[in-house]
Amino acid sequence: NIVYTDWQRDNYYRAVRKVVPDNSRRIALEGDHVTIEQRAKFCYYLSQTQFIDIAPATMRMRMIKSAEEIALIKIGAQVADLGGAACVAAIAEDVPEYDVALAATSAMTREIAKRLPHVELRDTWTWFQSGLNTDGAHHPVTTRRLKQGDILSLNCFPMIAGYYTALERTLFLGQPSDEQLRHWEI
């Protein structure tokens, strides 16, 4: 870890410079996590160093999972299913989107805490949109109240130990109209 103050611009890069040995010839960076500006600053403060982009290799390595990782991901999928069920149970006419999302997120958080009592509880969330709010993927949850015939977008994302799984479903409140069905069948 690097400790630095931010009282002067670029102190982070100065701190990195102090801990990188002078004879360092190469440093690996994940290029897709470094902005153009950040890369330029690394090159400026570590001008004798060559930077290698290891993002493709790192991504390939991350695709290989241990038995423990697979077990966490499977638990995440089960938790997402419970979140989806809680979401569906909360859906009713005149209920605001945020209440539906809160029900699903609370159910998932409680289930994670029950199954894994010593894990950090963070970054588990639900996106839930209704009606016109479903016109694009992953709009923020709003105070819009559900109406009969609404198309609904359910997205539950439990996060366990840095691994997230996703349950995404499209639903309707009541029966879809003939026009909605026609578009759905396209």
Name each model-derived stretch.
Residues 1-186:
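Active-site neighborhoods and metal-handling regions in enzymes and metal-associated proteins
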